[in-house]
Amino acid sequence: MDKERAQEIVSSSVMPNVTLNGTPIYIESVNTNTETANIHFLKIQKIHAKCL
């Protein structure tokens, strides 16, 4: 995704469906100087493990 499109998504009043490698994400902010974005994964699976 290019930085202009990512910035449009961040500025939008409606949260569109955005995915990263097929995983739903939320774009929190875009830094156009470094061409990076802060993202959050929307579906995080919790794994419980019991150590012996």
UniProtKB/Swiss-Prot annotation:
GO terms for biological process: asexual sporulation; sporulation resulting in formation of a cellular spore. This is Small, acid-soluble spore protein H. Keywords: Sporulation. It comes from Clostridium beijerinckii (strain ATCC 51743 / NCIMB 8052) (Clostridium acetobutylicum). It is found in: Spore core. InterPro entries: SASP_SspH. It comes from the Bacteria. One of its GO terms (cellular component) is endospore-forming forespore. Belongs to the SspH family.
